A protein has these predicted regions:
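Conserved beta-strand/loop subsegment of P-loop NTPase cores
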Residues: 181-184
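ATP-dependent carboxylate-amine ligase catalytic core
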Residues: 38, 55-58, 86-178
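Short functional linear segments
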Residues: 1-67, 74-76, 80-84, 91, ...
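Short active-site-proximal "capping" loops at secondary-structure junctions
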Residues: 69-71, 95-96
Length: 184
């Protein structure tokens, strides 16, 4: 499998933030050139690809936050409130200055070493799902980020996780995460 620039997506150890971020977007960029940008989400977004993977990794109580404005602010407020008594994982998007800001446990963002190591760890799962996809179908960046977040939060033994949905919950991979609560 190749990315948009023709570079192989086969397994290798991810050692830099740039490599990790490139992997998050590789499937999307490959498929984007074969999609109609104006097409409805139902035709070009495929959260079903990560459903089994994300549900399998959803072992901690979660809340998902969706809506058109203020999702990140609400997710951050919920996380801060819960941190008074719990260890809390938080995934938001977009970031301000550093891609790793998207993944936090108790307001501490994932380290560069953990980010690269865990991206290397989940890469085979993602490549396995992507291996037989048609050119116009991709694993969404949100699905890959959710996989990384769940893996990281489990490793850090978080008591509760807060996830900000991306663009539209119905076709958003974050909605595949088993959650006890949803906030709109």
């Amino acid at each position: 499998m190749n990315n948009a620039s023709g570079t192989s997506l086969e397994f290798h150890k991810i050692t830099t933030l740039k490599e990790a971020e490139d992997f998050v977007y590789a499937s999307y960029l490959r498929a984007a050139t074969h999609q109609d940008y104006a097409a409805k989400d139902a035709g070009k977004r495929h959260p079903e690809l990560t459903r089994s993977l994300l549900r399998q990794k959803s072992i901690t109580s979660c809340v998902v936050v969706t809506g058109s404005k203020g999702k990140g602010s609400v997710a951050n407020m919920i996380s801060r409130i819960l941190q008074t008594n719990l260890s809390v994982g938080l995934m938001t998007s977009p970031h301000i200055t550093d891609f790793r800001e998207r993944f936090r446990v108790n307001d501490t963002m994932i380290s560069e070493a953990d980010f690269c190591r865990l991206m290397t760890q989940i890469r085979p799962e993602i490549l396995d799902i992507a291996s037989d996809l048609p050119e116009s179908v991709c694993i969404s960046p949100m699905g890959i980020q959710a996989d990384l977040a769940l893996t990281y939060f489990t490793e850090k033994h978080s008591d509760f996780n807060v996830f900000e949905c991306g663009k539209g919950a119905k076709y958003d991979d974050v909605n595949n995460i088993r959650h006890d609560y949803a906030v709109i």
